[in-house]
């Protein structure tokens, strides 16, 4: 995983499995795939993104790994929860997320020039929209074509 990327389901399975000190064969056996080479191969395929487990199997994997199934779910999450998991992924993937208290508020410090530049551009566009220097259509056009 590159800095700032989010983890896919397979990467999350691998992260938690390793964190739990579990071998692929062990996880395969716990979820009913058998503990031999076939089970290990299936888990490897899930972790490497070659196959995606269906929701019922994701439930079994979540139970075996002792985690909330929402962490592995491919179903829609709320925007806020998507952001939470994205921040967790960034933190694991080498883009440290610092939490700072300032004036009684908790703030995120992503300590990344790309985000600083982006936030400045976005703040300027929002100010331009508010002052009617640009139209709502111009603002939407900027957002959907943003390249960083």
Give a label for each model feature.
Residues 1-20:
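A short, Lys/Arg-rich alpha-helix, primarily the initiator
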Residues 21-45:
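Short alpha-helical DNA-recognition segment
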Residues 133-136:
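Charged, low-complexity interaction regions
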